[in-house]
């Protein structure tokens, strides 16, 4: 598929729809009438919260509550709190936190896209939690717009899109795997499937496999250890970070999050290819254009701050 600006523009528009709080400006806009903004010389303002990765989840009971769309950390802030320090201490492995305090204008197209995909994954996970709760409770809460029929349809669709979550489904993709006929080899179909891989073999690349959680593809040799190779080439993969090869040891929430990750990665797989093409060709002008679709400039924050 040849690269065009329209391709990437459509990709990022879809990502932005799936990740509504990707930019500081959009997070800032969620803090309407924030309780501490009318006070002088305080550490915790709506602007600082937004720049630290939080959007408002305020309620009458918790008027200073905010949440990170990338790691789900939710805090009811005090006016003396430093939002960035609270985020770092409360969720040090959050992808947003690990980037550091960098201006959005300095973030690469790849980083912005990865954050959007993480945000979309978390958002789907939270939606799925609501669906599961709806079906388990047997009734619909007044504030929940999901009907049982809607919940059932969405869960069936999710199961279909996340089949490669399980070892058995990944193993089933390795039909007549070439190394299985040999003795004393490290790289077997069972070891590949257990390490998170599914087969994408063809006549040319008979030992190719891919991870549905991170989309890394490798051509394996019979002496390769599938788990070690996965760690080596994709240390940030969600499956690798969980570190539980035995899926029987997964908690329900861990399985649901991994399933959400697969679904989102499938949805934006072609988009990942577009990003690769942009970076290979070093098309700076196009990258700047499409990055603006995702991230609003900082003066949006400053303009609203001056108008309060």
Curated annotation (Swiss-Prot):
Chain residues that bind Zn(2+): 68, 71, 87, 94, 211, 214, 230, 237
Gene3D superfamilies noted in UniProt: Inhibitor Of Apoptosis Protein (2mihbC-IAP-1), Chain A
UniProt keyword terms in alphabetical order: Metal-binding, Repeat, Zinc
GO cellular component: chromosome passenger complex; cytoplasm; kinetochore; spindle midzone
Disulfide bonds: none
Keyword Zinc: yes
Coiled-coil residues: none
Entry's Gene Ontology molecular function annotations: metal ion binding
Domain of life according to the entry: Eukaryota
Stored CDD domains: BIR
GO BP terms: chromosome segregation; germ cell proliferation; mitotic cytokinesis; mitotic spindle organization; negative regulation of apoptotic process
BIR repeats: 27-98, 170-241
Any one Pfam family match given in the protein's UniProt record, by short name: BIR
Family named by the database record: Belongs to the IAP family.
Protein name per Swiss-Prot or TrEMBL: Baculoviral IAP repeat-containing protein bir-2
Source organism of the structure: Caenorhabditis elegans
